[in-house]
From Swiss-Prot:
Gene Ontology terms: cellular component: chloroplast membrane
Gene label: FAD7A-1
Organism encoding this protein: Ricinus communis (Castor bean)
GO MF entries: oxidoreductase activity, acting on paired donors, with oxidation of a pair of donors resulting in the reduction of molecular oxygen to two molecules of water
Pathway: Lipid metabolism; polyunsaturated fatty acid biosynthesis
Protein name as annotated: Omega-3 fatty acid desaturase, chloroplastic
Length: 460
């Protein structure tokens, strides 16, 4: 059972709300930040008062007038220490440059149509020839890398080959992913053929994954209905044994979860991506699942044949290790597009959730030199909101949409040639993002202080 929990590439079920979010923030250009704190037993009442706050920059005082519903206990805090700021930023983010509060969980003041209108019309145009050129490029590189590695066949070249080839397997996956979204071309048959060839070659059931991924996009940010990398509820988290917790939140184990997720889905959810009668699918999709499973089986049979003809060691070097590098890329990228930001981001349920609010909790990431190799999958916010946009227009579409999204768009940290900075984000998230409350329509990750995130469970 422990294995099942670890091997979950998604999260689980509901993730509840931990802290109550203050809905109203207030600042002054001449004052330091103020902080609302709500006690569990607080009662709301109308406060209409005037008070003064001293400014560090000068001796002048600012008058404040409020006529809002606030918690019974209100504290004004100047010069918060780092620990308090870290806790507070999890709920209401602070724009340090302007000294303004920003509630990431508040409904946005714009609509999905507003974002769509800001994106140039040509960004929606799909060019199948251009899409196929990327397929040709990647396939040539894959076979070229394999030929060069087999030719030199020395232990200096193999590690470099494994990283490069695993990255290229990941690039093939992204192109197949575009086929699944229909952003590859307007021809469903072409999308299906190319998608099957690309995904089957790296042991991914095309239709099975396409359908579950569609569910992820349609329910992004929803604690119960999301399909990929959503959190554990507090009740489920506390029911796990120490070994399971260690495996679930200790690197590198979560980064190896994807193949197992394909077979058994997530804890708390039943179904396989290979079985036509799985709960993931509706009856009319049965034929598609059978087709994809047959293609996957054919690829597996080919690998077995090559294993006997070339030898298991050579196949391990040429295909096996690059495959697991690809899996790590997939889990690494998909996890960090929904986790690991410096500020805690909300998850929703019930009436608080909407397609727009859920999509705005996704994150863009900069991967340096890898951006072009894996087809700009790091431009994830616009991709999540409008998956029909081809990958080669995502950067332009994102730039056009930024002014509309404002603070709801979180500018990614600039990467060096390789995205090594993201390893820190991954480690921090594994240490801090453990579970969410069992109740509440807007919830945030909480941390189990006894769980280290890398070393496993810290017992008292």
């Amino acid at each position: 059972m422990a294995a099942g929990w670890v091997l979950s590439e998604c999260g689980l079920r509901p993730l509840p709300r931990i802290y109550s979010r203050p809905r109203i923030g207030f600042t002054s250009k001449t004052t330091n930040l103020l902080k609302l704190r709500e006690l569990p037993d607080s009662k709301s009442y109308n406060l209409c008062s005037s008070f003064k706050v001293s400014s560090w920059s000068n001796s002048k005082q600012s008058n404040w007038a409020l006529n809002v519903a606030v918690p019974v206990n209100v504290s004004t805090v100047s010069g918060e220490d780092d620990r308090e700021r870290e806790e507070f930023n999890g709920i209401v983010n602070v724009d340090e440059g302007k000294g303004e509060f920003f509630d990431a969980g508040a409904p946005p003041p714009f609509t999905l149509a507003d974002i769509r209108a800001a994106i140039p019309k040509h960004c929606w145009v799909k060019n199948p020839w251009r899409s196929m050129s990327y397929v040709l490029r990647d396939v040539v590189v894959v076979f070229g890398l394999a030929a060069v590695a087999a030719y030199f066949n020395n232990w200096v070249a193999w590690p470099l080959y494994w990283f490069c080839q695993g990255t290229m397997f990941w690039a093939l996956f992204v192109l197949g992913h575009d086929c699944g979204h229909g952003s590859f071309s307007n021809n469903p048959k072409l999308n299906s053929v190319v998608g099957h060839l690309l995904h089957s070659s790296i042991l991914v059931p095309y239709h099975g994954w396409r359908i579950s991924h569609r569910t992820h996009h349609q329910n992004h940010g929803h604690v119960e209905n999301d399909e990929s990398w959503h959190p554990l509820s507090e009740k489920i988290f506390k029911s796990l044994d120490n070994v399971t917790k260690t495996l679930r939140f200790s690197l590198p184990f979560p980064m190896l979860a994807y193949p197992f997720y394909l077979w058994s889905r997530s804890p708390g959810k039943k179904g396989s991506h290979f079985h036509p009668d799985s709960g993931l699918f509706v009856p009319k999709e049965r034929k598609d699942i059978i087709t994809s499973t047959a293609c996957w089986t054919a690829m597996a049979a080919l690998l077995v044949y090559l294993n006997f003809s070339m030898g298991p060691v050579q196949m391990l070097k040429l295909y096996g290790i690059p495959y697991w590098i690809f899996v790590m890329w997939l889990d690494f990228v998909t996890y960090l597009h929904h986790h690991g930001h410096e500020d805690k981001l909300p998850w929703y349920r019930g009436k608080a959730w909407s397609y727009l609010r859920g999509g705005l909790t996704t994150l863009d990431r900069d991967y340096g030199w890898i951006n072009n190799i894996h087809h700009d999958i790091g431009t994830h916010v616009i991709h999540h909101l409008f998956p029909q946009i081809p990958h080669y227009h995502l950067v332009e579409a994102t730039e056009a949409a930024k002014p509309v999204m404002g603070k709801y768009y979180r500018e990614p940290k600039k990467s060096g040639p390789l995205p090594l900075h993201l390893l820190g984000s991954l480690v921090r998230s594994m240490k801090e993002d453990h579970y969410v409350s069992d109740t509440g329509d807007v919830v945030y990750y909480q941390k189990d202080p006894k769980l280290s995130g890398i070393g496993g469970e810290k017992t008292e």
